[in-house]
Amino acid sequence: MLDNDFKIANTLACETVDINMTCLQGKVTTTYDELCEVFGYPTMTDGDPYEKVNAQWKLEFTVPFTDDTGIEDFHNVVATIYNWKTGYIPTEEYEWHIGGFNKDAVDCVYKKLDMVEEAV
């Protein structure tokens, strides 16, 4: 569980991020363009209308923390953002699915989106 005031040191959007065994943790309503602005282009796209997922970002967030003994370390939080059974890549405002190993994935996605909004 992440602290309320956690920071994100790094965000990696890459095809090699291991998302095996992740599952739906939450959702975020935003646009395709905003996701591309924040995370870059999707790491996977598929135009086939019969596929369950047409656009997906595989993400790994590096979250630093200090443990109880004062030693600095970091968590790697894996997240995915994807559409589900739309038959196309949504470009309008859409309720995107957030996958991960736990709810930290949702926290990191929201935090990163908020960081970009605050900088504008």
Q: How does the language model describe each region?
A:
Residues 2-120:
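Residues within mature, well-folded domains
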